[in-house]
Amino acid sequence: MKPMPLCKQIVALMFLVIPAGAQSHVDPGIVQRIKVEAYDHSKVMEHLSYLSDVYGPRLTASPEFNQAAEWAVERLREYGLANVHLEPWGTFGRSWSARQWSVEMVEPRYAPLNATPLAWCGAAENPITGELIVTPYKRIFDPRKAREALDAYRKEWAGKLRGKFVMLGEPKVPDEQTKPQFTRYTDAELADLAKAPEHMAKNYGNFEELKWPEEIEDFFKFLSSLPESTVDDWWHALQKVNIARGQFLRDEGVLGVLVWDPRAHDGTTNAEAAGSPKSADPVPPPTFVVTAEQYNRLARVIERKVPVRVRVSLKLEVSATDVEANNIIGEIPGTAKKDELVMIGGHFDSWHAGTGATDNGAGSAVMIEVMRILKALSLPMDRTVRIALWSGEEQGLLGSEAYVKKHFGDPHSMRLTPEHAQLSGYFNLDNGSGKIRGVYLQENDAMRPFFESWLAPFRDEGATTITIRNTGGTDHLSFDAVGLPGFQFIQDPLDYGTVTHHSSMDTYDHAIPSDLMEASAVIATVVYQAANNPDMLPRKELPPARPAASSSTQ
């Protein structure tokens, strides 16, 4: 190669190392202090035990959530944070907490059933016994076809369900488990993840005219091609169908409902919601997910014309009216640029089948630990570092969306607040308890050199992958929606997607201590660097205003 003149070498080197905005130097001594504090003096598993063992699960606005939130506030104050408080974000819905439940087959034989109630269903305060019947009802993702299926179900079963327990859905043998349930990313998988994804044209147009794929893999690929406003429309439309179904079953005098879920097998149940938390919406009958093996047994006995009777009990603590929900906020004040912010967070709420350890007690425990580390080391930081632990994430990013709208801007109008200019970036953790392997740039390629520098001290621990890709389903999207830098870290899968996600196995024992220690060290380093970076972090162009969910889907 022909030698380059010295002046050109210098200019070329400048372009290689200087991103859009000056970048702070990574001090190996500071990183080493962070690692020692994170690995040798860790409290992350203690935090997780309180959040999951003592207070879990943490359904939004439930007594358990509120007790856990008070614990987090006290712990952050103990660590010396400032401005620690519960910040209300609005009216959520009814507080709902299951106090006791049982589901049993009592005829033709006795058998206790492995079942979990779905949130915001109705109670059976005294045990109820009745006949169980199968009423086939297919799970459909196309909202129009889902409405048609509900209409057909009404016509077929109206007047036939009173005083009965119903099995809502046809039995199906669970798929064979041919792949490992616990995995870590391989080098090849990370290399593939680092590549830019295949570009897909966005499907704009009339929501009602979209053609939705029926196969689940094709459906989720199609869903990723939709703008966020259309995804919101889809979600609201399906919720309307579910609420209407619950109303029909209640009006028909159904005693209770058993449902089949493809994830519920091998002794594990998965549970989300049967209805809406809003007090204005109808309350469906007591509704339970039953493991596939037991669900299928019940259906086979009924198919053989042998009557089946079940006994159900469900004691609930439910508020009579809609209640307010809170986020948990705390700060380490900055110095030279104290009016500017770096934020970290993760959702604090969980579903209720397990104890919410990996979703997302782990992320919350890590973020509390990050603040402890930064405060314990008395690291000087120019910008204020703020932690936010969100509620309402599992019901649609409600807590973070409300916070962003209040403090930074409204994605539906793109009217921005003065604080919008003061937030440098937001870093989120919510993909289970796996160690950090890198970060999603969320199409903000100007951030690549920053993360390359900040993650370099953790290359030997596997944090090597920086991908231009987006990732969804969690609270960084609320910031991204108004043009703020928001990032979610790449984490090893472990058994998050196969076993623990929203399941009865989402417990402390499925968290890996060394992985959470590593995550704490990585994020503490990233936050320290971002807080002391000479300039604000680079941003993407502001997005256009996002249409509100259409009136037909509200």
Residue ranges and their predicted role:
Residues 1-11:
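Bacterial N-terminal signal peptides that target proteins for export
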Residues 26-62, 271-273, 349, 428-434, ...:
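N-terminal capping segment at the start of a domain
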Residues 27-30, 107-114, 123-152, 158, ...:
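Soluble metallo-hydrolase cores and metallopeptidase-like ectodomains found primarily
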Residues 31-39, 53-63, 119, 130-156, ...:
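Second-shell loop/turn segments in exported
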Residues 174, 234-237, 244, 248, ...:
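Acidic/histidine-rich catalytic neighborhood of metal-dependent amide-processing enzymes
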Residues 217-233, 239, 246, 250-251, ...:
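Active-site-adjacent substrate-binding region
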